Regions:
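C-terminal cap/substrate-recognition subdomain and adjoining C-terminal extension
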Residues: 2-3, 124-134, 142-243
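Alpha-helical substrate-recognition element adjacent to the catalytic core
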Residues: 2-10, 14-17, 21-31, 37-156, ...
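The start of beta-strands in P-loop NTPase/AAA+ ATPase cores
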Residues: 30-32, 194-195
């Protein structure tokens, strides 16, 4: 998001190289942590599909043309409706019903298959595996989304669970994302040495920086849930993985 553009250094890619250097030095005992949504996956195609289907149900032709570029933020559904041509007041009138429609679909195995890769992510993930360090995906997605998530990892040619990576998911959808990720910190410490952690959510990447003080905490300046959280000074922001 543009609010973090000022944090992205001209030589931001050096942080990614530094992670690989640490991974090569650590080998199999080293862990590199990645969130999924808006970190290695772009979920805007999923968001756009949901708006199109809502438009079909409501017979709103303008919404049936929704594409990822209609979103300025993946979480701003009302803004997408306005971008599609609905007057602001009419868009606001759909807010609650659309949110319910969205909630019944977004966090499902079927819909998450529509995600695509953040640019450069597949190549970078495979570069991490080449170092012999291990990847752990730590996501706020719940176990009911595992099948679709693994299918999407395969579609995007990313490192799969059991092939150099491990996938940690919330046991239940209702569990709070923040609490789950903090609980995962203990498991990560038991699995190995956390060398770096990548996450798009300021709250979550801050938690990694505070919990694993010797690790590189890397913020993906892509999209986030919109909570007004200031990034820790130790956190480095990058735009994507392509360099």
């Amino acid at each position: 998001m543009t609010e973090f553009a000022h944090r992205i250094a001209v030589d931001w890619h050096r942080t990614l190289d530094q992670v690989l250097e640490r991974a090569r030095a650590a080998g199999p005992k080293g862990l590199v942590i990645f969130d999924l949504d808006s970190t290695v996956f772009d979920n805007l195609p999923r968001q756009a599909r949901i708006v199109r289907e809502y438009g079909q149900q409501k017979h709103l032709k303008a919404l049936e043309t929704c594409q990822p570029f209609h979103f300025t933020s993946g979480w701003d559904l009302t803004g997408a409706l306005v971008a599609l041509g609905l007057p602001p007041e009419e868009a606001k009138g759909h807010q609650q019903e659309l949110k319910r429609f969205w909630g019944a679909r977004f966090f499902t195995s079927d819909y998450c298959r529509d995600d695509i890769e953040i640019v450069g992510a597949p190549r970078y993930l495979h570069e991490v595996v080449k170092t012999k360090a291990r990847i752990v995906y730590v996501t706020g997605r719940h176990e009911g989304m595992r099948e679709g998530t693994v299918a999407c990892l395969a579609k995007c040619r990313m490192v799969l669970p059991g092939e150099g990576a491990q996938l940690l998911m919330k046991p239940k959808e209702v569990q709070d994302d923040d609490a789950f990720k903090r609980t995962a910190h203990t498991l990560l410490a038991d699995l190995g040495t956390v060398l770096a952690a990548f996450d798009n959510e300021p709250m979550h990447v801050n938690d990694y920086a505070l919990r694993f003080t010797d690790a590189l905490a890397v913020h993906l300046a892509t999209d986030h849930s919109g909570r007004p959280v200031k990034l820790q000074d130790a956190v480095v922001s990058v735009p994507h993985f392509a360099y």
